[in-house]
Structures are given as C-alpha cells and as structure tokens.
From Swiss-Prot:
InterPro entries in the cross-refs: CP2, TF_CP2-like
Entry keywords, A to Z: Activator, DNA-binding, Membrane, Nucleus, Transcription, Transcription regulation
Annotated function: Transcription factor playing an important role in primary neurulation and in epithelial development. Binds directly to the consensus DNA sequence 5'-AACCGGTT-3' acting as an activator and repressor on distinct target genes.
Compositional bias per record (Polar residues), positions renumbered to this chain: 99-108
Compartments, record wording: Nucleus; Membrane
Name of the protein in its database record: Grainyhead-like protein 2 homolog
Lineage, uppermost ranks: Eukaryota, Metazoa, Chordata, Craniata, Vertebrata
GO biological process: bicellular tight junction assembly; cell adhesion; cell junction assembly; epithelial cell morphogenesis; neural tube closure; positive regulation of transcription by RNA polymerase II
Protein source organism: Xenopus tropicalis (Western clawed frog)
Amino acid sequence: MSQETDNKRLVVLVPNDAVFNPRRAYTSEDEAWKSYLENPLTAATKAMMSINGDEESAAAIGLLYDYYKVPREKRLLSLNKINEGHEDQDKRNCLPANETPSNLSTGENRVQVLKTVPVNLSLNNDTVESSNREKYTTSLSESPQPAPASAVTVVKAEEFTPVFMAPSVPYRSDGEEPRGVIFEQTHFGVHSITTHSDYLKDDQRSTPDSTYNESFKETTEKYRTPSVGTEEFLYEQTASSTFQYTLEATKSLRQKQGEGPMTYLNKGQFYAITLSETGANKCFRHPISKVRSVIMVVFSEDKNRDEQLKYWKYWHSRQHTAKQRVLDIADYKESFNTIGNIEEIAYNAVSFTWDVNEEAKIFITVNCLSTDFSSQKGVKGLPLMIQIDTYSYNNRSNKPIHRAYCQIKVFCDKGAERKIRDEERKQNRKKGKSQAAQAQCNNSADGKLSAVPLQKKSDITFFKTMTDLDVQPVLFIPDVHFGNLQRTGQVFYNTDDDIEGGVLVKRLLRPVDEDYGPPAPKQMKEGSRKVLLYVRKETDEVFDALMLKYPTVKGLLEAISEKYGIPVEKIVKIYKKSKKGILVNMDDNIIEHYSNEDTFILNVESLAEQGYKITLTEI
C-alpha cells in the first residue's frame, strides 16, 4: 500500500488574482494553448530534455498535451460524476477535513480545469521548503492536512476573461475564496521549475490568429490568410498588367500606330502561346493560384455579333466535315505538363486551367484562312484576332480579370514566311531611299531630315491588354452539334448557377433557315435523316450494310434484329468501342452525327437468361 502511495503524485491548481495583460486576446482557451503547444511532443524532444536533467518537466508538459487532446465538451464534466467515479481514498485525504468536494464547488457545477492560459506555471521540486508549500496549500483551507513534499506538486496559474467571449465558468467575486483543483498524477513526478515566460516574451506576444495582412495594405492584390477555406479564397488582381501572353510567331514589320500587334500564321501549323503572371507579388507563391483561361479566335471589334456568326457559318458550310474546328490544340507533353482541365467549349475557343506560380504553354493551330469568308476571288482577307480571357477559378463570375489580344492573318503553303520576306524587301528599299535623302540633306548647309524609323524582325509577339472586360466574346457552336456538346457538359446556359470557373458559354440560338451566307448542300440535310453503317462479324470478310430508318438507337436495334435475327427485346446492352479502345454507351447523338458510313466489327455476347450484349468496334 505504501508503494502505491509513493507512485501517485498530486497536482494542485490555484488560480491567481493577477490581472492578465489585456493586450493578449484569444478567442478560446484551446486556441491559446495550441499557440503555445503547436509542435508535437515527440520522443526525441523528451530524450533531449532528459539529457538536460528535465525529465519531470517533460512529464509535466506531456500532461498538458494529453489534456488538450481530449475535446473540450468531454473535459467539462459535472462534478458529481467525478466524485462518484473517484474511489481512491488517498486523493480525498489531500482535502481539508472540514471541507468536502461538494462544498468546494458551491455556486458552480463544472470543474475548472486549467482555465485559460497558465502564464506563470511553476512546478516545485523536492528541495522546496515546507514554508513555501504551506503558503500555497493554505489557500484551500485555514487548517490543511500536511502532505509529503514528494507527493504534492503545486501548479500556479493566472486567469483572465477572454476578449469577445464570455467565460465558460463564473469568476469568483472579490470576497470569494480561491478554489483549488486536484489532479491525480500516477505515472511520474515533477520536480523542476519552469515558467511560461520562457516560451513567449511580453513584447512579442500576439493572438493565435494574427496574420500578415497589415504588411500588404499598400498593394492592390487581395490575399486571404492560409486559414481561409479553399472555397472562400478569391484570386483578385486589379492591375491590368498582371498577366502577360506571348505568341511564338514572327510579327509583321508593318505595325500600325494605335492598333494591336499583327502576326502572320500558316494554316494548320502549330504555334506556342506562353502565359505567365507579372504582377507585383510575382515573388510570392500564392496559396490558391489556379486560374482559368480561354483562348479563342474572333473577328475584330468593328464586326458585330451577327456579322461574326454569319462569317463563321459560311466558313463551316464549306468544310469537308462537320467536325472541322476553327481552333485546335496539340497534345504535346510540354503543354500538358503546365495546363489542365482542357475543354473545347466552342468551335473557335478552348478553355484550360493553369497555375500562376508556373509558366504555362499551349500549342494552337488555326484552321481557317483570312480569305475563307467570301466567295469572291481576289478579295482582301479579313483580319482575325487571338483573344485570351483569364478568369478567377473560384470567383463565380462571367467577367474576366484580364483580357488581351493579338491580330493575325492566316495564309496557306508557307504564305506567312513569304509575306515577311516581302515586307523586308520593301523596308530595305525604304531604308535605301531614306539614306540617300539623308546624305543629300547633309551636303546642304542647313538641310535636315529625320530618319524613318524601321521595324526590327521579332519572332515573339506580345499580346496587347484590353481595358474593356464587359463585352462577351462571340463563340461559334453549330446548331447541329449543340445537343452533343450539351450532353458532354461542355456548354452552359447564361444563368448564375451554370457558370463554371468564371467561363460563360452561350448557346447561339439561330433559326435553321436563317441566311448566313450560301445555304448548305441538300445532300448534307438528307444525310442527317438516314444513317448507313457497314458491319461485319470478326470471322467474316465481307461487310453487311445496315440502313437505319431513323438515326436513333431504336433504329439501330431494329436494323440489327432484321439482319441477324436477334429479337429487339432480347438486346439489353449496346456499346460502341472507338479506335482508341474507349467503350461508351451507344446513343442517338453518336448514331446521328458520328456514325454515318462508318465501319464496325459486330460482337454479340450472350448474357445467360438476361439477353444479349452487342458491341460495335470501330475500325
């Protein structure tokens, strides 16, 4: 019995009357303690303290760590439950004989456990004089029972009223006696002396949730602290020069004053576009730095929306396939390592996300000529623009945070290089004439002639920033393909709930018979009503022709049933397998728009009593 008593130590907590410094404001006691004890107490830390002779200091701090690991609601237990659960008579003997636990908690039904921040935490050792121990223990009663020095450890703590928060335990009045809280310490004893002032200086104290916002008051950018949730963070940039875009293509030598840069491109050739951030906070790594950019090919600003749609529809009607796009991107590894979430949101636009902390690069090609928008020969080509809109990824707004453009003229068969050479020859002729005129003026006494400024050849074209961010760009989506784009989630209506990452895509609602140039050939209209498929089994060498009366799944099932004698009601699944090995459910859109006159291998698989599964593998 004596051995068990020696192994059990007691901790007495005595609240102090000292007023806590009002500058130190915490929102809760748990948050304040975590600001002191934010690093885990590892075995290596305990070993280092043991080497320095602080074995019991480590044990005391470990007690605090264990205490604050328990959720707060589980620590605030009623005193009656604690009194019923404690059967150890040695612990009760530490209380004065004339005072019981029930008297100790008069006017209060909760145990006050390490209330708020223990600023002056002192743990006495075996060498502390008995007079000092009696000074602390007399706060419990006028006639306390003596306790061995090795069995009692006294903890002194200050308490204060947290700012912006009512205290969870009533504070004692002026004439009220200080209360003591007893803890049982069974595994270790503490005999070293420590103070919390060693961990935090008065001049350097700050609240646990203090931030560095004060140091960025003068900047235009707005950043939230790291404690802000991902959904609440808004990457805001107000400076117009925040982003910089470059096109790796030769710039025209004949740049017009007041207009954007002009670049010559070849149709079908891929060019690299580099996107980067050049704001004032370039040196800082933003915690949430994803943005969404949309690269699009549009007409100049002098063309209104109806005119642009008229030109696009005329161009689309002259293409050899309805799938032909205005703008395509290359699947280069160099590009896909810097961008993500690529979406072909329109025939003339591509959307993707990228990290402003890193430089992004994407390779694009333009599939239309500047002369493709008129049926007349010898007409000067229309200038086009490559426009880049960048949106804040988390800000659900259809207004970009940055917009820039570059004018382009698209040629065929290396026409861009020939155009540059022609401009170089013209410039050299002007240079020769200018030098001759300058020499004549120098011969005269007072004749002066300013030299004509000459443009230098540049293989990099910088985009020009646009100040108008309110005008919505015109995105071209043919009506015949809108249903398929909507099914795949690439088109969103103009509503507040259907804006993703700040990118707004509008459906171009136009009557089918509206005149946007020459009408499409009648063969294309008739071909959309009937679909012809060439199908053979894997063991066959000759294809069978399946003529679908209706371009739907039902029409396909009826054609298969008629050709191969399989009842329609027995076919439970029908799939299409692409050349890349992608297996998809066959639907009406695939049959109507993407399967006419295609060749397939038919595979019929029996599913026991359920029916048949049919797979059409594209070849």
